[in-house]
Swiss-Prot record:
Claim: Metal-binding is one of the keywords in the record: yes
Species, as recorded: Escherichia coli (strain K12)
Annotated catalytic residues: D126
Entry cofactors: a divalent metal cation
Name of the protein in question: Mannosylglycerate hydrolase
Residues given in the record as a divalent metal cation binding sites: H14, D16, D126, H338
NCBIfam families reported for this sequence: PRK09819.1 (NF007331)
Signals that turn on the gene: Repressed by MngR. Induced by mannosyl-D-glycerate.
Cofactor details (free text): Binds 1 divalent metal cation per subunit.
Length: 877
């Protein structure tokens, strides 16, 4: 009799390092479970495989306390029995950056090679939805297979669990969906009644959905020890289901069967974030916004600032500190695990997540300062007071720069490398204790104070490089006064901005004549959800600052003006007060709106003082545009999403596990457009948005979501059981202060032609400044060589392709440059001009393995497809 299906039983564990329990609690279980796993693999030849959840952080946690077992692990990996990798941690894919996903795979696969070969499957059994760019990233590591659970439904193009999945550039993987999850084979009973009760309905679903009738029954669960009697269970399965064949397999064997039927597979494209058959938690992007903001800020510091700066320094002769960078990367990658960055954890775990981010940020800040200092210390005029300006974007930038200089003088002159005076504006000045500069000064009895000047300058800084200004103490400088010709509260060549009575803004784009009104109005509403999902209260009451009485202070400086808008919102203290239409709670709002004299951007800092619970705060940016779609960036590209999800009309009748609310994630920017005119909103960490309004559309950017439970049952937008467990998490109410920032950019034409992606990256990559003075708390010896006073490593146009990463190669003396095309539909070429002679240029995989022959020069062949990244390795003279 031909088998109805072949059922592949794969022993595994899903290992959340932390969740409602801490890493240290799970580590104790890990030590226990690993001993059982190793003993079974060593002693039982029939127990062929064990999958270690696709992440090497498990091994790192284990070896921290059991280093003596490295050889035991290595033997089992080399034998193909213990299956490890390819990830470092089980990452989220919708709210972390492209480079974070790339480094997660890079470090995970490099860790694997110390023990054997990694599993070459993009294995994400529990992440909350799948980015449409994952096939492209997987291919960059030679991975052509993926296995996941969440996000698919038949509206993507098939109701089958096996298909081909493509990214926008055509990168392709073979996909196997786990339609009932990764734990349907957990704790399998050994008796017939128990097995039939569990599996009869499962087999019907699995076989109906399968093209190949190769069925997966993963034998494992969260923190589950291996099932000792699995062979007894398999014998019972063969007895009660004789029409099916049961085998112990590794996932690769299933994919071999799928790939043999490639011609029968549908081809799907795009992201998978449907919660029809399983929960994807579309609104988890706004939980614990303090952590989300820190995460984005530190990602940007490492990728946009530190790595390019370290590369500049390396090309000048200084050491590239791979070990320090790997340490900080791994700290934040631990936080990128889906539960951790989703922030659906206990308060104690969230405190540990914050601590890891603080450690990584402290390392990044100090290493940035170290590299700037090494460069400044080793210029020809090394003892002179200097201000060194670093531009880590690949085109020259004229920027208004706010920075601080310290010196032992009450006045100073600032000059450039040609001896010309540099005008500057003094924003603030204060005395500081000399011990804060260098404790050795006061150690020898010198207590004369230093002066600290916060200054503003307007300078052009070379592309991917730096320039030096010189500080002459006790000399009169070209100090200029504040200027303003504004008719409204703020004005420059591009914008006229006025204040409404409720504290919101009226904007006029002078070039296009387009008007925007009620911009930056704060909206407050209920949140009866949990750490996984937003859900409104049954008795909703939406409040805006319409009755606020704002106080507005205007500060005009030399090249920049700011409006500081302050007001309080009276809001319900909790859900009970909202139901009773009472409002004894309070949200303090301080908006700082900054307009530079030569900028199309309006930069906004939002400072909140939240003194209420169970609510959501959003900032609204109304536009005059009537459109049914919105553009947002994603990893290595951008995509258009509908303003409204049509599935919302019938989601309850169709039995969705959660409502398909049109609340989406971005990474750095989102844009609305009608005709040739558009408005983009840039953000750092505010990665959740919705577009609301009937005709004229409004951006609604989530600022804060306060909830008090990790999991909660029977939400309006997510009926049924709690996600996670019903654990109190008072810290997730986010009482107290929260600061965030965004920027508004108007443009004409397409987002691609206007360089919206490039402008967002530039906003997230501010010019860095280093003030070199003769004293420093920490001493450094000088290098045995000098560096130039001005330097530019490379140059690219401010449109077209965009840099994703600039770093030194991990294993050779070359520069790695990863570029991508951010456009959704247009191809583009890349032009890179190095200031140094290029001995050779090779194209590589994302793992930095060379794939093409070396070419002389820096010319890059062929156009970049939409959403395509390419990685190049340069050997410089």
């Amino acid at each position: 009799m031909k088998a109805v299906s072949r059922v592949h039983i794969t022993p595994h564990m899903h290992w959340d390092r932390e969740w409602y329990f801490t890493t240290e609690e799970s580590r104790i279980l890990l030590v226990n479970n690993m001993e059982e796993i190793l003993c079974r693999l060593e002693q039982d030849n029939e127990y062929k495989y064990y999958v270690l959840d696709g992440q090497t952080a498990i091994l790192e946690d284990y070896f921290a306390v059991k280093p003596e077992n490295k050889d035991r692990v290595k033997k089992q990996v080399e034998a193909g029995k213990l299956i490890i990798g390819p990830w470092y941690t089980q990452t989220d894919t919708t709210i972390v950056s492209a480079e974070s996903i790339v480094r997660n795979l890079m470090y995970g696969m490099r860790d694997c090679l110390a023990f054997g070969e990694p599993m070459k499957i993009g294995y994400l059994p529990d992440s909350f939805g799948m980015s449409g760019q994952l096939p492209h990233i997987y291919n960059g590591f030679g991975i052509t297979r993926t296995m996941f659970w969440r996000g698919c439904s038949e509206r993507h193009g098939t109701d089958k669990t096996e298909f081909l999945w493509q990214s926008s550039d055509g990168s392709e993987v073979t996909a196997q969906v786990l339609p009932l999850g990764y734990a349907i084979g957990k704790y399998l009973p050994a008796d017939e009644n128990g097995l039939r009760k569990r599996l009869d309905s499962y087999f019907d679903v699995l076989e109906k959905a399968s093209v190949t009738k190769e069925i997966l029954l993963p034998n494992g669960h969260d923190q589950m020890p291996l099932q000792q009697n699995i062979f007894e269970v398999m014998d019972k399965l063969r007895e009660i289901y004789p029409q099916r064949k049961f085998v112990m397999s590794r996932f690769e064997e299933v994919f071999e069967k799928i790939e043999a039927q490639r011609d029968n597979l549908a081809t799907l494209k795009g992201e998978f974030i449907d919660g029809k058959y399983m929960r994807v938690h579309r609104t988890i992007g706004s939980t614990r916004m303090d952590i989300k903001i820190a995460h984005a800020r530190i990602e940007n510091k490492i990728v946009n600032l530190l790595e390019p700066l370290a590369t500049l320094a390396w090309t000048l002769g200084f050491e590239y500190h791979h070990g320090l960078l790997e340490k900080m990367w791994k700290e934040i990658l631990k936080n990128h695990a889906h539960d951790s960055i989703g922030c659906c954890c206990s308060d104690k775990v969230h405190r540990e997540i914050v601590a890891r981010f603080e450690l990584a940020e402290d390392m990044a800040d100090n290493l940035i300062r170290f590299y700037m200092r090494k460069i400044a210390d080793n210029m020809p005029q090394s003892d002179a007071d200097k201000l060194v300006l670093f531009n880590l974007m690949p085109w020259p930038r004229e920027e208004v720069i706010n920075t601080t200089v310290r010196l032992r003088a009450s006045q100073f002159n600032l000059r450039d490398d040609r001896g010309q005076p540099v005008p500057y504006f003094i924003r603030h000045a204060r005395e500081i204790d000399p011990g804060l500069i260098d404790r050795q000064i006061v150690h020898y009895g010198n207590y004369d104070p230093f002066m600290e000047f916060d200054i503003q300058i307007n300078q052009i800084v070379p592309s991917m490089g730096y320039r030096t200004l010189y500080i002459e103490a006790n000399q009169p400088g070209n100090v200029i006064a504040a200027k303003s010709d504004a008719e409204g509260i703020l004005e420059n060549a591009f914008w006229q901005i006025a204040l409404n009575e409720d504290g919101s803004l009226q904007l006029v784009d002078k070039d296009s004549g387009v008007r925007y009104d009620r911009v930056l109005q704060i909206e407050e509403s209920s949140d009866d959800g949990d750490e996984y999902d937003y859900s409104p209260a049954k008795e909703e009451w939406v409040i805006t600052a319409a009755n606020a009485k704002p106080q507005c202070d205007i500060i005009h400086e030399a090249w920049q003006s700011r409006a500081v808008i302050r007001y309080d919102m009276a809001v319900p203290l909790n859900l009970s007060e909202r139901s009773a239409r009472q409002s004894t709670g309070r949200v303090g709002v301080v908006l700082v709106v900054t307009l530079s004299h030569n900028s199309r951007r309006i930069d906004v800092d939002i400072n909140l003082d939240n003194q209420a619970d169970d609510h959501r705060l959003r900032v609204l940016v109304p536009t005059p545009f009537n459109t049914d779609s919105v553009l947002a960036d994603t990893q290595f590209g951008s995509l258009t999403r509908p303003v409204n999800d049509s599935a919302m009309n019938n989601w309850q009748q169709e039995g969705w596990k959660e409502a398909p609310v049109p609340v989406w994630n971005m990474l750095n920017y989102v844009a609305l457009q009608e005709g040739r005119n558009g408005m983009a909103v840039f953000s750092e960490g505010l990665r959740e948005f919705e577009v609301i309004g009937e005709e004229k559309k409004t951006f609604a950017i989530t600022l804060l979501r306060g909830v008090g439970l990790l999991g909660k049952e029977d939400l309006l937008l997510r009926p049924g059981r709690p996600s996670g467990i019903k654990m109190p998490v008072p810290d997730s109410q986010l009482r107290g202060l929260l600061s965030c920032r965004l920027s508004l950019l108007s443009y004409t034409g397409t987002p691609t032609a206007a360089g919206v992606a490039q402008q967002a990256r530039a906003w997230l990559t501010p010019v860095q400044c280093y003030n070199k003075i003769p004293w420093d708390v920490m001493k450094l010896n000088k290098a045995g060589f000098n560096v130039p006073e001005s330097y530019s490593l490379l140059k690219m146009p401010p449109v077209g392709c965009l840099i994703s990463a600039l770093k030194k190669a991990e294993d050779r003396q070359e520069v790695i440059l990863r570029l991508f095309n951010p456009a959704e539909s247009a191809t583009c070429d890349a032009t890179v001009a190095f200031s140094r002679e290029v001995i050779s240029c090779s194209e590589t995989m994302m793992d930095e393995h060379i794939t093409t022959e070396e070419n002389q020069g820096s010319n890059l062949s062929g156009p970049f497809l939409p959403g395509q990244s390419r990685t190049f390795s340069y050997r410089l003279a």
